């Protein structure tokens, strides 16, 4: 009678595969991590931190974001209060160039190396691109900081224009796994987003692509999303946690439990051992102050400081003080050039 094969513990396997060899966990392995009981969370976070330190180093990249054009978006992303299709309190508004420059100055003062200009649109029109170009030129004249953009889906011509403006990194989130995406957005497809990201990479800009956890996806779909991102190989992955917005289709969803959110952070680190993994929106309501520390000691190596697009973040000083306490240096601007 043959005995059943001995099952290798997923964290022991991850230690040998990811920490020692630098080989990412695959989709089924990520699912095993996500299914771990809460009593193994501390062990999981410690492993994810070790992986981050070995393959990324101790530095933390700091970024600020600003909304150039807020609200009035024609798309129906179910999590977003900036959609013009929902009964949310956000109304369309434009930011003027002097305010944009001042925001960039304040971001740079925090020690940030990256400043991202965001617009709530399906994709940019000529007016928006002209405003972005003027904003980038004005910022460059007064502030020493890398500039990123997040302007929705792009044509090849628009990609080339942004590259010519000197945009360092372009953010366009896939938001969730390919199989779950139709439950989140119906006015465009996951493949349309993927195509924009492909063109951005081919134009020589860095690719920033992540999403939001806690939008009703199953653990299987969360593991699928990690695998989708691993296939894309982005330079940066921002991890958001759903902060349900009043008036949106997802306004009544439950906030992700903190233990599940932290488990997800660690799992994504094990799926993306060399990628910039950024704490983004929703971490305050999902994790609180203690969770910020646990996340940075559990695989995270980048943060957005200050407020987000339509929700409040932690004061920049709190995050920066935390990095000092943890003896984690802020990534300097000259390290990103």
Swiss-Prot record:
Binds 1 [4Fe-4S] cluster. The cluster is coordinated with 3 cysteines and an exchangeable S-adenosyl-L-methionine. It comes from the Bacteria. It catalyses: (4R,5S)-dethiobiotin + (sulfur carrier)-SH + 2 reduced [2Fe-2S]-[ferredoxin] + 2 S-adenosyl-L-methionine = (sulfur carrier)-H + biotin + 2 5'-deoxyadenosine + 2 L-methionine + 2 oxidized [2Fe-2S]-[ferredoxin]. Its EC number is 2.8.1.6. It holds the Pfam family Radical_SAM. GO terms for biological process: biotin biosynthetic process. [2Fe-2S] cluster binds at residues 116, 149, 208, 278. Keywords: 2Fe-2S, 4Fe-4S, Biotin biosynthesis, Iron, Iron-sulfur, Metal-binding, S-adenosyl-L-methionine, Transferase. Its cofactor is [4Fe-4S] cluster; [2Fe-2S] cluster. InterPro entries: Aldolase_TIM, BATS_dom, Biotin_synth/BioAB, Biotin_synthase, Elp3/MiaA/NifB-like_rSAM, rSAM. Residues 58-283 form the Radical SAM core domain. [4Fe-4S] cluster binds at residues 73, 77, 80. Pathway: Cofactor biosynthesis; biotin biosynthesis; biotin from 7,8-diaminononanoate: step 2/2. PROSITE patterns: RADICAL_SAM. One of its GO terms (molecular function) is biotin synthase activity. Belongs to the radical SAM superfamily. Biotin synthase family. Homodimer. PANTHER family: BIOTIN SYNTHASE (PTHR22976), BIOTIN SYNTHASE, MITOCHONDRIAL (PTHR22976:SF2). NCBIfam families: bioB. Catalyzes the conversion of dethiobiotin (DTB) to biotin by the insertion of a sulfur atom into dethiobiotin via a radical-based mechanism. This is Biotin synthase. It comes from Rhodococcus jostii (strain RHA1). The lineage of its organism: Bacteria, Bacillati, Actinomycetota, Actinomycetes, Mycobacteriales.
């Amino acid at each position: 009678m043959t005995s059943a094969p001995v099952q290798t513990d997923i964290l022991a396997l991850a230690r040998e595969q990811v920490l020692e060899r630098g080989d990412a966990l695959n989709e089924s392995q990520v699912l095993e991590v996500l299914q771990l009981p809460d009593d193994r969370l501390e062990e999981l976070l410690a492993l994810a931190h070790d992986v981050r330190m070995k393959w990324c180093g101790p530095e933390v990249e700091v970024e600020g974001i600003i909304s150039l054009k807020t609200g009035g978006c024609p798309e129906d992303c179910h999590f977003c209060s900036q959609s013009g299709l929902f009964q949310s309190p956000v109304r369309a508004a434009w930011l003027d160039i002097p305010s944009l420059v001042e925001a960039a100055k304040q971001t740079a003062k925090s020690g940030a190396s990256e400043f991202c200009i965001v617009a709530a649109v399906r994709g940019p029109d000529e007016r928006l691109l002209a405003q972005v170009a003027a904003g980038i030129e004005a910022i460059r004249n007064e502030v020493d900081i890398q500039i990123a953009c997040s302007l929705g889906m792009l044509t090849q011509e628009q990609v080339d224009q942004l590259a010519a403006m000197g945009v360092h990194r372009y953010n366009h989130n896939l938001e969730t796994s390919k199989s779950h995406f139709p439950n989140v957005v119906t006015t465009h497809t996951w493949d349309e987003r993927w195509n924009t990201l492909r063109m951005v990479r081919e134009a020589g800009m860095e690719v920033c692509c992540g999403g939001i956890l806690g939008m009703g996806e199953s653990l299987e779909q969360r593991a699928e999303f990690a695998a989708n991102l691993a296939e894309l190989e982005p330079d940066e992955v921002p991890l958001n946690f759903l902060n349900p917005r009043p008036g949106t289709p997802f306004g009544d969803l439950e906030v992700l439990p903190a233990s599940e959110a932290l488990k997800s952070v660690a799992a994504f680190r094990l799926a993306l051992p060399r990628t910039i993994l950024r704490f983004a929106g929703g971490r305050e309501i999902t994790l609180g102050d203690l969770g910020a520390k646990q996340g940075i000691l559990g695989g995270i190596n980048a943060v957005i400081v200050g407020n987000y697009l339509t929700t409040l973040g932690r004061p920049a000083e709190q995050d920066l003080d935390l990095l000092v306490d943890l003896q984690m240096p802020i990534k300097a601007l000259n390290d990103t050039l």
